[in-house]
Amino acid sequence: MADKTVVLGYGVTGRAVVSALVSRQEKVRIVDENPTQNLEEVAQESGIEVVDVTKGFSWGEVLKDCSQIVLSPGIRDDHPIFASARDASIPILDEFDLASRWDKRPCSAITGTNGKTTVVTLVVEILNQSGIRAEAAGNTDIPLVQAIDDSDVEHFVLESSSFRLAHSLNFLASPATWLNFAPDHLDIHRNLDSYEQAKSKIWDGISRNEDAIANLSDPVVARHAPNGCTSFGTTSSTCRVQNGFLLFREEKVIALDDVLRKFPHDLENAQAAVATAIRSGATQEACAEVLANFSGLPHRMEDLGFVKGVRFINDSKATTPHATISSMRAISEVTLILGGQNKGLNFGDLGVLKPNGVVAIGEAADHINEVFQNICPVQIAKNMQEAVEKSVAMTRSGGTVLLSPGCSSFDWYNSYKERGDEFRSLVMEHGRKVKDE
């Protein structure tokens, strides 16, 4: 009898999926292509079947007695499990599908190449301010299958990556918001079209067209937006910036002078958050309260202050050229620390930038040097300390040192957070040294 669920990948999401299935008396088989001792210990203690990929196996054998497959985020589009599942007519699911099957509480969903975490955070805060108990889940530290264990939550706000959307079958979220689109994750998706199609699935589960919240200033998003959607990003959108105010429909939500963060991308995020929150049941008063006090998240245009007249900004979360371009548009007189591990993206787009200087880091340093060598001075740094030292030497008083790498962090670090933390620490150390001089 085919009654087992194969869980591919045993990271944060995989562990949560296995735990949720086991707690519901489901039979589970774990496949992890980078097994750890911890996984072996879990298998021994719980009696869960684990496939040891180091000892030789076939996907046909792995899928024997299997009724469904749940993928962890980040499985490549060309992974052999897809062909094997198709041949055996076994459905492939995402954790969102399981959670939607088990729990019917309302969900909002946010996707986009950039800005997801910020908008999710804003929507959660606005809903809570409105008296609706909300929690973030999904592409966060808490997968949805884990979040639904909290019976006090009234509304889930889901950070929805392309990895999750690509393999969801029956995921229901309404409203659902698409922030923007730019090349990303081409080391995972077959091509740019595959990435776009994954993102567009955000609207598959909406209840009505008004619950599709779309950035109409982005041509890719606009192309997929249904008629009657709730829009933002243009001067004629449902939610827009006009005459010094942020409006929803024709009502003033908040004066721009009262919004704490006013970079162009901040105002776009604010529009998305207001539209999503109001469609989720929030009040305009709550929107205004949150936007007036929201100072941003770490590693996202995080202002570290000034040292001898030079401003330092930590934008380590910028892991694509698109994100770096967006950040650079917000400031001038910039020395840019750029680089890391490329995700199969085209750095040529960065050529539109006009920084005062570039410090190139990581695996992509040589490629970045090629892009900017005829635009501005470029130096290559072997580590972050050297990058900070060289950027300081290149920057005059009144200028800004911006860490906005445009790449993932996995050449030097375990995460963009670790990269940003080191940059922040080095800037603080630089400030102390200058003060002691």
What role is predicted for each listed range?
Residues 4, 16-20, 24, 256-355, ...:
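Nucleotide phosphate-binding/pyrophosphate-handling subdomain across enzymes
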Residues 39-47, 345-399, 435-437:
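C-terminal helical cap/extension that packs against the catalytic core
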Residues 32, 54, 93-97, 216, ...:
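Beta-strand->loop->alpha-helix junctions that form or flank phosphate-binding loops
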Residues 29-33, 212-216, 337-339, 354-364:
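Short internal beta-strands
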Residues 1-94, 98, 361, 379, ...:
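N-terminal leader/targeting and accessory segments in enzymes
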Residues 21, 69, 110, 139, ...:
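Residue-level signal for inorganic ion chemistry
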Residues 12, 76, 114-118, 267, ...:
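Residue-level detector of alpha-helix initiation sites
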Residues 3, 57-64, 73-216, 220-229, ...:
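Phosphate-binding loop of NTP-binding sites
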